[in-house]
């Protein structure tokens, strides 16, 4: 799950609104950042690439083959539940579906192939977003999320072994209308395994066309504002997740459940275009580099792997639509 602690929950665009003074409450976003997304629907396809799997377990062994494609469907909804000048609270819901399609495996009975091929991996989650602003230049943002990640079937209530919890609190400083920075400590799955790590946020707008937005080590992006209705992002992102799956085949029969841990680095370009005020679409393309892709015993923290996989870089294409607050709501 990607670290997300960005921006105010109802971002404004005018300099008179987002400039922080000693007598006004700080707004974390900087000039040029787009309105926050209230609803997102995206489809992604990672194209064919080779994969090699190794295991120290003699019963599992090694294998290689081709991942014909990875299909991903993503739905997110976020809405405010409390708004005031100094404190904002929002609630978010998400659904994510990921499907791996293998072909040309050197051993069709290989444990990895049996456990992952054409098996829908789902993530259903809920997140709470808190933003506290003080008069002047300081603010606090926190995101708490819980997700149920795994290969559970629709209509079946998942057990607690599918539960994933992430938290990311941060303090920030709004230097002026063009610059905002801050930092915090996160607990999450950006590296595939559950990890506690520091992060740093830096947002800067240089002029009416160019800016940067970054949450290190999660992402760093260059923003090009062609107009108020078209924005181009390009940069690098670190994405990760963890799924609980039920193993298939005799080689892994000793394990009740396994944990698929994945983390990847992405180089991308993303174009966002307004269709009508609150209705936008986006198209994203890039290259995915696998950092971690492994099966391990389903424990909270377990550095040992059962199957370690190496994937070659692969191109990906993503398209979607999203809704933002109408401009009149921010006036």
Predicted regions and their residues:
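Sec-dependent signal peptide cleavage junction
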Residues: 8-47, 51-58, 327-331
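Outer-envelope beta-barrel architecture signal
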Residues: 33-39, 85-91, 136-142, 177-181, ...
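Transmembrane beta-strands of outer-membrane beta-barrel pores
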Residues: 43-49, 93-101, 146-152, 185-191, ...
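Surface-exposed strand-loop-strand hairpins of Gram-negative outer-membrane beta-barrel proteins
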Residues: 46-72, 111-116, 306
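Outer-membrane beta-barrel translocator/channel fold
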Residues: 50-57, 107-108, 216-317
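Residues that define the transmembrane beta-barrel architecture of outer-membrane proteins
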Residues: 67-73, 118-124, 159-165, 194-198, ...
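Residue-level signature of outer-membrane beta-barrel architecture
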Residues: 77-81, 128, 132, 173, ...
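Outer-membrane beta-barrel "beta-signal"
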Residues: 200-203, 271, 310-331
């Amino acid at each position: 799950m990607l670290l997300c602690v960005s921006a105010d929950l109802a971002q404004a665009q005018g300099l008179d609104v987002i400039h922080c003074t000693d007598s006004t409450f700080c707004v974390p976003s900087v000039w040029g950042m787009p309105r926050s997304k209230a609803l997102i629907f995206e489809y992604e396809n990672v194209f064919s690439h080779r994969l090699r799997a190794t295991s120290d377990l003699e019963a599992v062994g090694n294998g290689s083959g081709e991942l014909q494609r990875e299909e991903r469907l993503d739905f997110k909804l976020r809405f405010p539940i409390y708004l005031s000048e100094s404190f904002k609270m929002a609630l978010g819901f998400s659904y994510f579906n990921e499907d791996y399609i293998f072909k040309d495996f050197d051993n069709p009975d290989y444990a990895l192939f049996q456990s992952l091929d054409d098996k829908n991996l789902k993530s259903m989650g809920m997140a709470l977003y808190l933003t506290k602003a003080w008069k002047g230049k300081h603010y606090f943002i926190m995101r708490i999320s819980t997700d149920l990640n795994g290969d559970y079937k629709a209509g079946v209530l998942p057990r607690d072994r599918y539960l994933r919890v992430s938290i990311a609190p941060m303090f920030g400083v709004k230097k002026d209308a063009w610059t905002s920075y801050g930092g915090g400590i996160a607990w999450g799955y950006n590296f595939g395994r559950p990890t506690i790590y520091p992060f740093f946020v830096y947002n800067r707008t240089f002029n009416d066309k160019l800016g940067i937005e970054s949450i290190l080590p999660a992402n760093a992006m260059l923003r090009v504002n062609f107009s108020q209705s078209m924005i181009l992002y390009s940069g690098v992102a670190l994405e990760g997740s963890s799924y609980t799956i039920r193993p298939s085949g005799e080689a892994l029969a000793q394990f009740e459940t396994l944990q698929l841990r994945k983390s990847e680095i992405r180089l991308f370009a993303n174009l966002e275009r307004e269709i009508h005020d609150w209705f936008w679409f986006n198209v994203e393309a890039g290259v995915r580099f696998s950092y971690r892709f492994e099966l391990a015993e389903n424990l909270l923290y377990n550095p040992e792997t059962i199957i370690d996989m190496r994937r070659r870089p692969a191109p990906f294409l993503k398209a979607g639509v999203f809704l933002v607050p109408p401009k009149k709501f921010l006036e």
